[in-house]
Regions:
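Structural preference for solvent-exposed beta-strand-turn elements
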Residues: 1-366
């Protein structure tokens, strides 16, 4: 029999992080449940859909050790709606009794023995990295942008983690755009594709942490902090050799304020909706002007201009949504936008000395 006391705030937060992983697979109804189990002086709260398992640990006053599984959404919504304060949890047979002030309930559960075994990674044998949480969250945002939603090309639905020239890189592509982030210096060798959905879970689960440990074995990845652990299967397959898509030089290089580039792009996009989002970017070296033109056959047309440093004249047509999305996630005051003619990939980087983020957008045929 388990009998513990926890705070409503910590329990609600942990349950809300776990509940979305609970699956609705009819063949395994127990995956709708989450696992509660005492673990030393803490309460373990875990959920899995057999592809990913997430575990949260919260401090608890433990009278009796034990475990149970209970419906994820019901218990999460119930605890979330309770007032702040202590919550008493007690198991009796296959039922969880919950008491908090004037509120009490009994939730039917299933014995923990029927719950799938939570996956683990052998830390001694794993490839390990220690990463600043904020740096990781930023890298996830910047690369997940280019992840494909096409499940028939599974390797493109994740983010590729790999080492190159002494650094750990993250990369993603959907065939129309490519994002690459240099994360940390490291000589540890890894080549693994992590599902984008796993990285989304990691991002929302580590808000209060400063460092996170990432461990890889041949088929799994584990993200671990003191109070959280997420273990996920890797995507099987070989990621494309994307580096050949990144141009080594550029005929036309444009240095422009990000705010100016964003404004003219968003205005042009208003008139590009009828034409599949296509906008034409023209660079004039003589006038130091970047102009963006778009046409809507029913509404009219638009040309917007911004001052920029331009190395050579050039013109290219892009999807306005792709350009707007990448400009929204770059922090720099100035952007370097470069290309080699109408049909070559366009490169977007921050205008800083050693930029660690590269974004590629393939042009549209104008």
């Amino acid at each position: 029999m388990m009998k513990v006391s926890v705070t409503q705030e910590k329990l609600a937060k942990a349950l809300n992080l776990i509940k979305d992983i609970a699956s609705s697979r009819n063949e395994l109804p127990i995956l709708n449940n989450i696992l509660l189990r005492t673990d030393g002086g803490r309460l373990l709260i875990a959920g899995t859909n057999l592809e990913i398992a997430s575990t949260q640990y919260i401090g608890a006053k433990i009278e009796d050790h034990g475990s149970i599984t209970i419906p994820a959404r019901l218990v999460s919504e119930f605890i979330t709606n309770l007032p702040s304060g202590p919550v008493e949890l007690e198991t009796k047979n296959e039922h969880l009794h919950i008491t908090s002030g004037k509120f009490s309930s009994v939730i039917n559960g299933v014995v923990a023995d029927e719950y799938p075994e939570l996956p683990t990674i052998d830390e001694k044998a794993a490839v390990q990295y220690e990463i600043d949480v904020e740096d990781l969250k930023k890298a996830i945002v910047q690369t997940k942008l280019a992840v494909s939603s096409d499940v028939t090309r599974a390797v493109l639905t994740g983010v590729y983690w790999h080492n190159y020239e002494g650094s750990l890189y993250l990369a993603a592509t959907d065939g129309y755009r490519l994002a690459e982030k240099r994360l940390i210096k490291s000589d540890n060798e890894v080549s693994a594709i992590i599902p984008a959905s796993t990285l989304a879970e990691v991002s929302k689960s580590v808000s209060d942490e400063k460092k996170i440990t990432v461990l890889f074995d041949d088929s799994q990845v584990c993200f671990k902090t003191g109070d959280m652990e997420i273990v996920s299967r890797l995507i099987d397959g070989k990621f494309p050799d994307y580096r050949q898509l990144i141009p080594a030089t550029a005929e036309t290089e444009i240095v422009i304020k990000k705010s100016d580039f964003s404004r003219v792009t968003k205005i042009a996009a208003l008139f590009a909706r009828e034409s599949g989002g296509g906008i034409t970017i023209t660079a004039s070296e003589e006038n130091s002007l970047l102009s963006i033109h778009s046409i809507a056959s029913e509404l009219g047309e638009n040309t917007s201009e911004a001052t920029a440093k331009i190395s050579a004249d050039g013109q290219v047509t892009l999807n306005s949504r792709y350009l707007t999305e990448v400009l929204n996630i770059i922090d720099a005051d100035e952007i370097v936008f470069s290309f080699n003619g109408k049909l070559s990939p366009c490169v977007i980087r921050e205008q800083i000395k050693n930029p660690d983020y590269t974004h590629i957008i393939m042009p549209l045929k104008s």
